[in-house]
A protein has these predicted regions:
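Catalytic center-proximal scaffold of phosphoryl-transfer enzymes
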Residues: 1-254
Length: 254
C-alpha cells in the first residue's frame, strides 16, 4: 500500500520533522498539523494547502522552484517561450544570490536588506513576468505543457510574490524538498516500512536525524549519548526535551 509522509521545516531554526498518519495526504491531516500554527506557510501548489488561504494568522506563500520546474519541462514543447520564462525567474534568483553574498560578507543575515533588495530588483521583474504571461498564454495551444505552466504560475502569482514582503521568507521551499531526499534514498534501499506503526516510527527517527543535521550535530554521537541518558532521565523525572538535537549540544558540553 502506498502512503505519504509529510515534511515540515522551520526555516528560521532549521528544525524539521516528518509526520505519518496512516499514509494519508488529506486535508484533515494538513489541518491537524498546522491548525494552531501562526505565521507563513510555504508550499507547492497542492490543492490541500488552499484551505489555509485567508485563515487568521496564516499567510500562504508559493514556491518559485515548482513554477520554474514546469517551464523547464515545457522546453521540449516550446523552447522559445520556456527560455523566456526561465530568464525572468533566473533574475529573481540572481537577487537572492546578491543578498546571500552580502550576508556572507557580513557573516550574518540582514533580513531588512534582503527585503529592500527584493522590492527594488525582484518585484519589478515579477510584474514584467506577469505581463509576459498574459501575452504569451494567447500563443499556447490549450492543455499544452506551456499553457499549463503559465496557467499554474499566473494563478498563484500573488502567493509567489509574497516573499518580497519579508526578508525572512524564502523564494522557494527547497529546504523541504532537500529534507525529503534521505527518505527517498531509504525507500529505494529498504523498499517499504511494513505497516503504519513502522512508518510512524521511521518518521520520528528521520525527524530527529534531520534536526541533528540542521544543527550541525553528529547524528551518531547524539544517538549514542541520548540513548545512554534516557534511563537516567526516566528515573529522575527529568525533561526529555534536553535530549533533543537542538538542545543536546549544550547538554553534552557540560
Amino acid at each position: 500500500m502506498k502512503g505519504y509522509v509529510w515534511s515540515v521545516v522551520n526555516v528560521m531554526t532549521g528544525d524539521r520533522f516528518f509526520f505519518y498518519e496512516h499514509g494519508s495526504r488529506s486535508t484533515r491531516v494538513a489541518m491537524g498539523l498546522l491548525k494552531d500554527f501562526t505565521g507563513a506557510i510555504q508550499s507547492d501548489g497542492y490543492i490541500v494547502y488552499e484551505h489555509f488561504e485567508g485563515m487568521e494568522g496564516k499567510k500562504l506563500l508559493g514556491c518559485w522552484a515548482h513554477a520554474r520546474r514546469r517551464f523547464f519541462e515545457a522546453k521540449v514543447e516550446n523552447e522559445k517561450l520556456a527560455l523566456e520564462a526561465l530568464s525572468y525567474i533566473r533574475r529573481l534568483y540572481d537577487v537572492e544570490a546578491e543578498a546571500d553574498a552580502l550576508d556572507a560578507a557580513d557573516n550574518k543575515p540582514d533580513h531588512e536588506r534582503r527585503k529592500a533588495l527584493r522590492q527594488e530588483k525582484a518585484y519589478p521583474e515579477i510584474k514584467k513576468f506577469e505581463t509576459w504571461m498574459e501575452a504569451s498564454i494567447l500563443k499556447c495551444p490549450p492543455k499544452s505543457l506551456m499553457e499549463e505552466a503559465i496557467s499554474y504560475t499566473y494563478k498563484i502569482l500573488k502567493k509567489l510574490s509574497l516573499y518580497v514582503t519579508d526578508g525572512r521568507y524564502k523564494i522557494d521551499n527547497n529546504m523541504v524538498e532537500n529534507s525529503i531526499k534521505p527518505l527517498a534514498i531509504g525507500r529505494k534501499n529498504y523498499l517499504f516500512c511494513g505497516d503504519d506503526d513502522a512508518a510512524q516510527r521511521a518518521a520520528v527517527v528521520y525527524s530527529l536525524l534531520a534536526t541533528c543535521k540542521a544543527h550541525g550535530v553528529n547524528e551518531r554521537a547524539w544517538l549514542e549519548d541520548a540513548l545512554r541518558r534516557i534511563p537516567e532521565y526516566e528515573q529522575a523525572g527529568k525533561d526529555y526535551a534536553d535530549l533533543l538535537p537542538a538542545n543536546w549540544r549544550a547538554l553534552s558540553a557540560k
